[in-house]
Design a protein with these regions (language model features):
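Extended, helix-rich architectural segments
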Residues: 1-126, 142-144, 155
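Structured, contiguous alpha/beta core segments that scaffold functional sites
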Residues: 103-180
Length: 180
């Protein structure tokens, strides 16, 4: 049996979560499909040109987010480290992304912030849509991250994928354009 590559694992995981996460976001946005208790009701209302929704999903998510008191992360017992982290939090713009990061967690169960130094070795950090990212953990030690992946559709429909390892990045580009 052929060894499954990290690229194959990433593509499979990212493909698998798209439909489910899109559905969760539609529910949050109030676009839930109408569900009937019987076929008869479905037949009676099939020609109805109206939309009825009661979006309790958004109420639950928003009430949790509204009650959260978001703070800059800190390092317990390390004031200098906490000050540096606070500075990075501000400089990278994560302070402006806090709500979206937590909203992702509340809707999908996960959120991603990708941090990496730029060409000038200055740390950059960005919130990324959970539908576009995957974290793969070691099967024997679930606290150890093996790699992370992000894919996105670039200009012209080309799909790009980056695998993030602790010591390197691997870049992949599709040979042809794909329809999103």
């Amino acid at each position: 049996m052929a060894q499954v590559t990290d690229l194959q694992i990433a593509i499979s995981a990212l493909s698998g979560k798209k439909f489910r996460y899109d559905r969760l976001w539609r529910y949050y946005d109030g676009e839930a499909p109408l569900v009937y208790t019987s076929e008869r009701l479905r037949d009676v209302f099939s020609g109805l040109d109206a939309r009825f929704t009661e979006n309790w999903c958004a109420v639950v998510v928003d009430s949790v987010l509204d009650r959260m008191e978001l703070r800059t992360p800190n390092i317990s017992g390390d004031m200098a480290g906490t000050a540096h982290l606070s500075q990075l939090w501000e400089e990278t713009g994560l302070v402006d992304d806090e709500y979206a990061i937590h909203e992702d967690v509340a809707v999908t169960g996960e959120s991603f912030v990708i941090a990496w130094p730029d060409d000038d070795d200055i740390p950059q950090a960005f919130h990324n849509d959970a539908r576009l990212c995957h974290a793969e953990y070691d099967s024997e030690n679930p606290r150890r991250l093996r790699f992370a992946a992000k894919w996105w559709q670039a200009d012209g429909g080309i799909v790009r994928l980056t695998l993030y390892y602790p010591d390197r990045l691997e870049y992949y580009v599709s040979k042809r354009a794909y329809q999103a």
